[in-house]
């Protein structure tokens, strides 16, 4: 490239031939490429720009970067700006990043860490001598060449460009390596190149322990702790494993006071990095990557010994090809029609981005948050703004604003439709002072909403046939799956996902489009929408309803719970079961083969799917786990390839290199009894709450990191037994209240009183009641001020103060003639399950809408998140193998 150019506008493919994609980051893909003129290999980062982003500010930085030439710095070749893509061309480092390496090899040896630290310090010494800072030292930005040379990447031009783009996508991941003076820049008055030395110390710990300190904490929580005056610099956890020299090196690098922190030149004189260290150490590391020795990185799980009883990895449905006699209830299943369950207002969203990063036709089903453009307009700002922290804002404030920008803290709604009672709430009276007001959005009427059950199903009250539909902020829940009778159906021409029930929902679709104008033009361009998923044929235009269909016969598992997931690559839909024998899956697109596959060999009592992340309570110690679902399926395929002599169930779940370790324990969550997940409709935050033996943990979903992260740990005497554990969202509070019981009401017109723990309080503070708890089987928040409480044979619909909700369109009480075990809320009714069947009752009239009863079978609801899953066993043999059903449409419904 001509050195006179700072940002070339010519076609980069005239100079470089792309060979293969070698990486994918939060803001672009990285390709291995070859210079067509010289044959020299290069690494090219291709970044897709968003409209309005201007990189003129980095042109001077690009020119300056051409002067940076050092053996420990990735060489910068140049940049291209072509159409809406920015190409950054750099030196190719075939060994990969240290982060990629330790994911395969496990922790680096002390000598390897010393070698890498020395080379990193040499690169920083050069940069600092040129008056430059790196600002982003971490394992992911330290690369190895094929012959073991260490190179610093993503600084200078890349750091400046990353800074702008990170404001929208990746910024939240960086606080763990940041120095305290960076976090408190507003109070401390800026920072200098010594922040890079702090990052060297953190990176040394990262290479030794596979993650930086505080990595399990929510980024905001980590930043907050760093700004506290009593913050203590982190240390290596294992005192005996590492030498005194290593411990002292980390201590020196992590000197809290930057004025006392040694420079790169000074640290290069430390005995830890002045010992005999050769490039052969890095070459040994690369050899380990290319030829991993599984025996060297076993990370066995001492708490969870291998299962005592061998369970099959694959379970086939019985009588798959034999025509068998149907039970009485199965005959009725084919005759009784049900409306699909609907999303409740507090249910976390399930977004399914396609390979291009945009949502396809499934967007109309799963995407309920406003677009990024809406948020930018609402807050009067785009992606511009100061990233580096010598500006007027502290890092804490910048990250908080970034969370606002991403919708983590956003869009408060007006409460004009609330009852007068809610403005004099006995519940709110015990709540600490409200948070400062947040920006308000355009008001969208809320009177139409309500919803469903403990497994995050939903209800949005719809008018009866003939009544005009009213606008709603939350779109309908996905229609139930419709199963092919013999073989998978090739899905080509799907109906609009909003056309649930003929004309009535057609009007709903039109009104939804009016409220989401930013997506309208894109939808109009799609004459033929993509299928929602394989195994989910398009919903019929006419209102034929759905019914229960058998998906598995003779299941030997002791199942506790069920959910579902759509693979973003294949679009196949899977049922996921949590059982005593482990976590199993069933592909709804392969019911002609009908077999369950084991995904995880540990006992599972609760699970929940969030995007491509599976949360579970698993293992002998009942600990919260986080699983990467695509990785979990790949891992299962790896297990199938093992020799028959090595039963998969006897392999510890992390015997393979860390690269394949897709299931991780969430720290500080042992002996978890129950969990619940909720979305705050006022802010868009999504929370996971777990009840431990003597405390409660609250975690928040961090979208850029695609994981739940700890924000609160509250000591609390958990009731025993713990019958009730749900979160309730209240206005003007950042965190939801945690309901641990329900007692009889004491105030005027109060039918129930919620016993709650308040995470917003600065102390472990909870409501106390001198009245005994009622026998409540179910509590769920349908709307912001509408809660469904299930008591024995009765369902009461109350507000946050426990008073009955009265409405012409809604009965405040629904009565059943049996003991309710579980419920699912449908469009216009509640479906209650009992031991020998189920009954639906209308929200409007309390009249029976559906009923199925079979005294020869015992029924149990396994889950209703996206898909309603039902189990039945023979009454005369309750331990016999079970049959499994889902609420689904019929092939003949077209």
Curated annotation (Swiss-Prot):
Q: Which Pfam families does the UniProt record give?
A: CNH, Pkinase
Residues the record marks as active site:
136 (proton acceptor)
Task: List, separated by semicolons, the cofactors it needs.
Answer: Mg(2+)
* SS bonds (residue pairs): none
CDD domains, from UniProt?
Answer: STKc_MAP4K3_like (cd06613)
Q: Does the keyword Cell wall biogenesis/degradation apply?
A: no
What residue spans carry the region label Disordered? 410-536
Any GO MF annotation of the entry: protein serine/threonine kinase activity
User: To which species is this protein native?
Assistant: Homo sapiens
State what changing residue 45 to E does. Loss of kinase activity and ability to activate JNK family
Its Gene Ontology cellular component terms are: cytoplasm
Q: How does it assemble?
A: Interacts with SH3GL2. Interaction appears to regulate MAP4K3-mediated JNK activation.
What is the top-level taxon of the source organism?
Eukaryota
Which residues are recorded with the post-translational modification N-acetylmethionine?
A: 1
Entry EC number(s): 2.7.11.1
Composition bias (Pro residues) maps to: 473-487
Q: Which residues carry this modification: Phosphoserine?
A: 329, 398
Task of the protein: Serine/threonine kinase that plays a role in the response to environmental stress. Appears to act upstream of the JUN N-terminal pathway. Activator of the Hippo signaling pathway which plays a pivotal role in organ size control and tumor suppression by restricting proliferation and promoting apoptosis. MAP4Ks act in parallel to and are partially redundant with STK3/MST2 and STK4/MST2 in the phosphorylation and activation of LATS1/2, and establish MAP4Ks as components of the expanded Hippo pathway.
Q: Which UniProt keywords apply?
A: Acetylation, ATP-binding, Kinase, Nucleotide-binding, Phosphoprotein, Serine/threonine-protein kinase, Transferase
Positions of ATP binding = 22-30, 45, 48
Any Gene Ontology biological process: intracellular signal transduction
Q: Under which name does UniProt file this protein? A: Mitogen-activated protein kinase kinase kinase kinase 3
Tissue localization of expression: Ubiquitously expressed in all tissues examined, with high levels in heart, brain, placenta, skeletal muscle, kidney and pancreas and lower levels in lung and liver.
Q: Bias regions of kind Basic and acidic residues — which residues? A: 513-529
């Amino acid at each position: 490239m001509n050195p006179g150019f700072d940002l070339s506008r010519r076609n980069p493919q005239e100079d470089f031939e792309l060979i293969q994609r070698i990486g994918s980051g939060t803001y672009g893909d990285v390709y291995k490429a070859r210079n067509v003129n010289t044959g020299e290999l290069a690494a090219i980062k291709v970044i897709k720009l968003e409209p309005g982003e201007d990189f003129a500010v980095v042109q001077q930085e690009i020119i300056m970067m051409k002067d940076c030439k050092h053996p420990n710095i990735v060489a910068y070749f140049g940049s291209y700006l072509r159409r809406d893509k920015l190409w950054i061309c750099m030196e190719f480092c075939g060994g990969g990043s240290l982060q990629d390496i330790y994911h395969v090899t496990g922790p680096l040896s002390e000598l390897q860490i010393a070698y890498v630290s020395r080379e990193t310090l040499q690169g920083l010494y050069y940069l600092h001598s040129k008056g430059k800072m790196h600002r982003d030292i971490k394992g992911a930005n330290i690369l190895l060449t094929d012959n073991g040379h260490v190179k610093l990447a993503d600084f200078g031009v890349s750091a400046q460009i990353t800074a702008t783009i990170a404001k929208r996508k990746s910024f939240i991941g960086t606080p763990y390596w940041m120095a305290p003076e960076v976090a408190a820049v507003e109070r401390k008055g800026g920072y200098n190149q010594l922040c890079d030395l702090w990052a060297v110390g953190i990176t040394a710990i990262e290479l030794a322990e596979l993650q930086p300190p505080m990595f399990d904490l929510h980024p905001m929580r980590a930043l907050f702790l760093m700004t506290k005056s009593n913050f203590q610099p982190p240390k290596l956890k294992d005192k005996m494993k590492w030498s005194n020299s290593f411990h002292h090196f980390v201590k020196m690098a992590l000197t809290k006071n930057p004025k006392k922190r040694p420079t790169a030149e000074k640290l290069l004189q430390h005995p830890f990095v002045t010992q005999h260290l050769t490039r052969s150490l890095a070459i040994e590391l690369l050899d380990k990557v290319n030829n991993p020795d599984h025996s060297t990185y076993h990370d066995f799980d001492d708490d969870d010994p291998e299962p005592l009883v061998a369970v099959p990895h694959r379970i086939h449905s019985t009588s798959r090809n034999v025509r068998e006699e149907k039970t009485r209830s199965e005959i009725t299943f084919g005759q009784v029609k049900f409306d699909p369950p609907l999303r409740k207002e507090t249910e976390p969203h399930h977004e399914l981005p396609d390979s291009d990063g945009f949502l396809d036709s499934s967007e109309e089903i799963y995407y309920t948050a406003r677009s990024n453009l809406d948020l930018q307009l609402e807050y009067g700002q785009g992606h511009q703004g100061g990233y580096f922290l010598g500006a007027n804002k502290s890092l804490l404030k910048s990250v908080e604003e970034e969370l606002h920008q991403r919708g983590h803290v956003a869009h408060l709604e007006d409460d004009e439709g609330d009852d007068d009672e809610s403005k004099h709430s006995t519940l709110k009276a015990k709540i600490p002072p409200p948070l400062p007001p947040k920006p308000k959005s355009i008001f969208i009427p809320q009177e139409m909403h309500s919803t469903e059950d403990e497994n995050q199903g939903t209800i949005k009250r719809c008018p009866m046939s003939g009544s005009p539909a009213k606008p709603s902020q939350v779109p309908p829940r996905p229609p139930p799956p419709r199963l092919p009778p013999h073989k998978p159906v090739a899905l080509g021409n799907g109906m609009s996902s909003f056309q649930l029930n003929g004309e009535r929902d057609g009007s709903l679709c039109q009104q939804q489009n009016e409220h989401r104008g930013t997506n309208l033009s894109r939808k109009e361009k799609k004459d033929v929408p993509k299928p929602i998923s394989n195994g989910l044929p398009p919903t019929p235009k006419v209102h034929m309803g759905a019914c229960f269909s058998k998906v598995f016969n003779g299941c030997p598992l002791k199942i506790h719970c069920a959910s579902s997931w759509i693979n973003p690559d294949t679009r196949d839909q899977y049922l996921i079961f949590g059982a005593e024998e482990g976590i199993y899956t069933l592909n709804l697109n392969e019911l002609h083969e009908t077999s369950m596959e084991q995904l995880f060999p540990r006992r599972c009592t609760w699970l929940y799917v969030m995007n491509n992340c599976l949360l579970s309570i698993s293992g002998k110690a009942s600990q919260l786990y986080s699983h990467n679902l695509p990785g979990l399926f790949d891992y299962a395929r790896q297990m199938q390839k093992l020799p028959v002599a090595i039963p998969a169930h006897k392999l510890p779940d992390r015997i393979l290199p860390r690269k394949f370790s897709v299931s991780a324990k969430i720290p500080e969550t042992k002996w978890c009894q129950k969990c619940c997940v909720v979305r705050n409709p006022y802010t868009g935050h999504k929370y996971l709450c777990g009840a431990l033996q003597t405390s409660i943990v609250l975690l928040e979903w961090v979208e850029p990191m695609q994981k739940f992260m700890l924000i609160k740990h509250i000591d609390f005497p958990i009731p025993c037994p713990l019958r009730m554990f749900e979160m309730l969202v209240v206005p003007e509070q950042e965190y939801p209240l945690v309901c641990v019981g329900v007692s009889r009401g004491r105030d005027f017109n109060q039918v129930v009183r919620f016993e709650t723990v308040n995470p917003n309080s600065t102390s472990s503070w909870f409501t106390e009641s001198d009245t005994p708890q009622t026998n409540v089987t179910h509590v769920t928040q349908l709307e912001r001020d509408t809660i469904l409480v299930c008591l024995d044979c009765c369902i009461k619909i109350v507000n946050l103060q426990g008073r009955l909700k009265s409405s012409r369109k809604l009965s405040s009480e629904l009565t059943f003639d049996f003991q309710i075990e579980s419920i699912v809320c449908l469009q216009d009714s509640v479906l209650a399950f009992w031991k020998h069947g189920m009954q639906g009752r209308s929200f409007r009239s309390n009249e029976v809408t559906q009923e199925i009863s079979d005294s020869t079978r015992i029924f149990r609801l396994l889950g209703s998140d996206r898909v309603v899953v039902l189990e039945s066993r023979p009454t005369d043999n309750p331990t016999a193998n079970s049959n499994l059903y889902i609420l689904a449409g019929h092939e003949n419904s077209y």
